[in-house]
A protein has these predicted regions:
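Aromatic-anchored segments of alpha-helical transmembrane domains
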Residues: 32-33, 116-122, 185-198, 256-262
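Membrane-interface loops
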Residues: 40-50, 54, 84-181, 190-191, ...
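Membrane-embedded alpha-helical segments of multi-pass membrane proteins
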Residues: 68-75, 160-165, 206-210
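Membrane-interfacial, low-structure loops and terminal tails that flank and connect transmembrane helices
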Residues: 1-17, 89-100, 224-245
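N-terminal transmembrane-helix/juxtamembrane module of multi-pass inner/ER membrane proteins
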Residues: 1-76, 135, 293-307
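PTP/DSP superfamily signal
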Residues: 223, 227-325, 334, 409-420, ...
Length: 521
C-alpha cells in the first residue's frame, strides 16, 4: 500500500511539473510579444513624456544590481516548478495535497497572465519614457545590460512590470525562518534594482507594487476570485443604501483622481506625498465603490479577524478612514453595553481594550465580529478558551437576511455554550443591534419590534430604520422555517426509529410464538 501511495504521489508531482511547463510555454511568448509591442508602439509615436520626482536625480547608478534585476526571470521560471520547496513545499512527492497545489499553480498562472494584460493596457493608455540616459557599461556586467537593451526600450514605465511580477513571486514563497529572511533580502534587492539600474522611475515602481497587490486581491490562493464574486454578487439595485454609498465612493474616487491630475499639473513633483495620497485614495475608494455596488463583503477577504496583505495594501485609505470614524463616534462611550444574559454590544475593540474586557468581572470569552471593514484582535492571547466568530457585513448597507441568519445562529451557539459574548461592529449601533434583536426574538418568540426597542433601551445610539427591520424580519422567518423543518425532521426520525423498534418487537414475538408452538407439538 505504501509503495502504491508513493507511486501515485510521484505521478501527481510529474503532472504538476507538466502543468507548470504548459503555463510557462503560454506565458513566456505572450510576455515578450506584448511587452515589445507596447514599447515599439511608444517608439513609433515618439513618446517624450515622463513622470519623475525631483529627488530621483540623487538615486545612484549601480551596475552590479543588474544581476539582481535579471534574477527575477529565473525566479519566475522556478515558481512554476516548485523549486525545491521554495515556492510550494507541499508539491514534493510524498507531501501535501496535489489537488490543492494544482489549484495554487493555476491561480499563480492566472495572476501572471492578468498582471501582463493590465500592465500592457496601462502602457498603451499612458505611454511614458524614462527621462535619464544610463551610462555605458563595459565588461562582464555590460553583457547583461546589452541583453536587456536588446528587447527593453526606455518606455513601458507605469506600472513597473518587474515590480509587479516580483510582488506575485514573493507572495508564492513558502519558506520560513532564516531562509525566509534571505528570500526577503533578495526581494528587496530586486525591487531596488529597477531604480539603481535606471530602468524605472519611483512612481512606476510604486505603481507596480500596487498592481501586484491588485492582482493578488483579485486572484487569491484560496477563496473566490474577483470574477466569481462579480458573477455571484448581489447587485445594489435592490438596496438603496448600498446604491447611494457606491455612488458616493465612486464620486470620491473620481474627485481624488481628478485632484491628483490637477495637482501634478499645478504643483509638479514638489508635492509628491500629496499626489501619491490622492492617487492611492482614488484607487481605494474606487474599489470600495465596486464592493458596495456588486462584490459584497467577501471582497475584503477578511479571515480569522484579519485582512490579507493585499487588501490592507489596496484599501488602506478606506480602512484608515473607517477606523477613525469608529473611534470618533464612540469616543464618549467606548465601553460595551449589556443587553441580555451574557450578551453585550459594543464597538470593535482594540487588543488592549479586549484584554481589559476579558480580565474584567464579566469575563468576556467570545467575540462575534460583524465588521467587514475593521480588523479584529483575533490574535488575542487570552488562552485557547477564547472563541472568535465572524460574519462580515458591510457598513451602512442593508444586510442580506441569509447573513443575518448565520450571525444569529453563531451567536446562539456561543450562548448555548455558556460564553459571555461581545457582539461588535464599527459603532455597535446598527449591525450588532440588528443581529442581537433578531436573536432575542428568535429565542423568546417576542415580536422583533419589541426586541429592537429593548436593545435600544440598553445601548444608546441604536437606530434601526424600517429597511433593516424588514431584513431582520426576513432573517427571522428563515430561521423559524428552518427550525420547524429541523423539528419535523427530528420527529420523523424518532417515528421511524419507533417503527423499526415495533417491527423488531413484532418479529421477535412472532418468533417466540412459533418456537413455543413447535415445542408444544
Amino acid at each position: 500500500m505504501s509503495c502504491l501511495l508513493n507511486a501515485l504521489q510521484k505521478e501527481a508531482s510529474r503532472k504538476l511539473w507538466f502543468r507548470g511547463a504548459l503555463w510557462l510555454a503560454v506565458l513566456g511568448p505572450f510576455f515578450f510579444l506584448s511587452y515589445n509591442f507596447a514599447g515599439s508602439l511608444a517608439e513609433v509615436r515618439q513618446i517624450r513624456a515622463s513622470l519623475v520626482f525631483g529627488w530621483e536625480r540623487w538615486i545612484p547608478f549601480r551596475p552590479w544590481t543588474i544581476l539582481a534585476y535579471w534574477s527575477l526571470i529565473l525566479a519566475c521560471i522556478a515558481s512554476f516548478f516548485s523549486a525545491w520547496g521554495i515556492f510550494s513545499p507541499d508539491a514534493r512527492p510524498g507531501r501535501g495535497d496535489p489537488d490543492r497545489e494544482r489549484q495554487r499553480l493555476d491561480r499563480h498562472g492566472e495572476r501572471l497572465l492578468l498582471c501582463q494584460l493590465l500592465t500592457v493596457a496601462c502602457f498603451l493608455l499612458m505611454p511614458l519614457r524614462f527621462s535619464y540616459t544610463p551610462p555605458r557599461v563595459e565588461g562582464f556586467l555590460g553583457g547583461f545590460f546589452a541583453m536587456l537593451y536588446a528587447f527593453d526600450q526606455p518606455y513601458n514605465q507605469i506600472p513597473s512590470l518587474h515590480v509587479a511580477l516580483l510582488t506575485l513571486i514573493a507572495a508564492r514563497c513558502s519558506l520560513g525562518g532564516v531562509w525566509r529572511g534571505a528570500f526577503n533580502s533578495w526581494v528587496f534587492l530586486v525591487g531596488i534594482s529597477v531604480l539603481t539600474t535606471w530602468q524605472q522611475h519611483f512612481i512606476g515602481a510604486l505603481a507596480g507594487l500596487l498592481l501586484g497587490g491588485l492582482v493578488l486581491w483579485a486572484v487569491p490562493d484560496d477563496g473566490p476570485t474577483l470574477r466569481t464574486l462579480w458573477r455571484e454578487g448581489r447587485s445594489a439595485r435592490d438596496d438603496p443604501d448600498r446604491r447611494v454609498l457606491a455612488r458616493i465612493y465612486a464620486a470620491a474616487s473620481f474627485a481624488c483622481l481628478a485632484w491628483c491630475v490637477f495637482g501634478w499639473a499645478c504643483w509638479g513633483s514638489g508635492a509628491a506625498a500629496i499626489w501619491l495620497f490622492l492617487a492611492w485614495s482614488g484607487l481605494a475608494l474606487g474599489l470600495t465603490a465596486l464592493v458596495y455596488a456588486r462584490l459584497g463583503p467577501a471582497a475584503l477577504r477578511k479571515r480569522q479577524g484579519g485582512l490579507p496583505p493585499a487588501s490592507l495594501w489596496l484599501f488602506w485609505p478606506y480602512l484608515a478612514g473607517a477606523w477613525l470614524n469608529s473611534r470618533w463616534w464612540t469616543r464618549g462611550r467606548p465601553a460595551p453595553d449589556h443587553v441580555a444574559d451574557r450578551i453585550w454590544i459594543g464597538r470593535m475593540p482594540g487588543r488592549r481594550e479586549l484584554e481589559r474586557l476579558a480580565a474584567s468581572e464579566h469575563g468576556f470569552d467570545a467575540l462575534l465580529d460583524l465588521a467587514a471593514e475593521l480588523p479584529a484582535p483575533a490574535s488575542f492571547a487570552g488562552g485557547e478558551d477564547f472563541v472568535y466568530a465572524a460574519v462580515p457585513l458591510l457598513e451602512g448597507a442593508i444586510p442580506d437576511p441569509e447573513d443575518v441568519g448565520r450571525a444569529v445562529l453563531r451567536l446562539d451557539r456561543l450562548h448555548r455554550a455558556g460564553r459571555t459574548t461581545l457582539v461588535c461592529c464599527a459603532l455597535g449601533e446598527v449591525r450588532s443591534a440588528l443581529v442581537v434583536a433578531v436573536w432575542l426574538s428568535f429565542r423568546s418568540g417576542a415580536p422583533l419590534a419589541d426586541a429592537v426597542a429593548g436593545v435600544a433601551r440598553r445601548r444608546r445610539g441604536v437606530a434601526l430604520d424600517e429597511a433593516r427591520i424588514q431584513a431582520g424580519q426576513a432573517a427571522l422567518r428563515l430561521l423559524l422555517a428552518r427550525k420547524r423543518a429541523g423539528d419535523l425532521a427530528e420527529r420523523l426520525s424518532r417515528w421511524r426509529a419507533g417503527q423499526r423498534e415495533a417491527i423488531k418487537k413484532s418479529f421477535h414475538n412472532s418468533h417466540e410464538m412459533a418456537s413455543n408452538a413447535g415445542r408444544e407439538s
